[in-house]
Amino acid sequence: MRFEEFKYVRKGVIVGLLIMLLYIIWPFIDVLAYSCAFAYMALPVYNILRKKFNKTISAGLAISIYILPIMTITIYALLTFMEIILSFNTKSIEPYINEILSIYNSFMLERIINNEQIIAKYIDEFIKYLVSQFSGKIIDVGYLIVKVIMVLFLTFYFLRDGDKAKNLIISFVPDEYKEKMRIYLSYLHDSYKNLFISCVSLSIIITILSYIGYLILGVPYAELFAIITGIFALLPILGGWMVYISIAIYFFLIHDYTKAVFMFIYGELFLSIAPDFVIRPYLVKKEVDIHPVLVVIAFLMAPLSLGLSGFAIGPLVVGALNAFYLAKYRDKKI
């Protein structure tokens, strides 16, 4: 075999292996996306810790500091949601339930009672359904736990060894395109920092600040209102102001003017002015600011299309395209 022929065979083998690798990791593409997202979100904390600790300790501490508040807020929200469900007053809908049951009894129940085989059949099918659903949920929970563990490990390694990824990618690029790839990766890094640090991290900070404010005022279900405020803060036009202004109006309507004024001032200072004019400029560069339409696509359309994985995959895709546009067409550097 001549050298030229061997080169084509080698390239074919490499392409085949890459396709096989893609096939293996495709079911876990959401794990990779979330790991990348969490790594960027924890990057500011990692950079601060890196001044005093080595890479391994800094990455571990950054993950702990960043993920613990998220887990705490999520657990609070779930417990609050369960409390709302358990405290639901069923007496208000009892007349409707009784009416439905009476109609059902008059048409169906007498025929079913007269046929014991039908009763046994329905009971058997119901038990099989419960068993299949329960076993399926156990498998789903186990699968989810495995994915969460994988996200934690991959986030750790992305933080610790992320700087090596750039050199690894450039090493696969032909020499004449290495400089352009270097420029594009720089834009990509800034674009992801803007999306994940500016948008997502800012949303988490607003969630925590709003939770503190709602607790001080004694707002019922403060955890849920704080999470809603953080989610609204992600979206253009809407914003977290819709939540705290509504709460202020509520206090005003019940003649609790002190709380209404406090909610308005606290919301304006800590949930609007401070995030936009103090925290956001500190986190990201203005030159790579993301257009509001792209934010909607990344954080609203992508989750609606792809499910929960869209919260991570959407920003990754939008960030990559935005970086290409900025480098290629706006600044004409590649």
Curated annotation (Swiss-Prot):
Its main location: membrane. Keywords: Cell membrane, Membrane, Transmembrane, Transmembrane helix, Transport. Coiled coil: none annotated. One of its GO terms (cellular component) is plasma membrane. Pfam families: AI-2E_transport (PF01594). InterPro entries: AI-2E-like (IPR002549). It is a multi-pass membrane protein. It comes from the Archaea. It is found in: Cell membrane. The chain crosses the membrane at residues 13-33, 61-81, 138-158, 191-211, 234-254, 259-279, 293-313. Belongs to the autoinducer-2 exporter (AI-2E) (TC 2.A.86) family. This is Putative transport protein MJ1177.
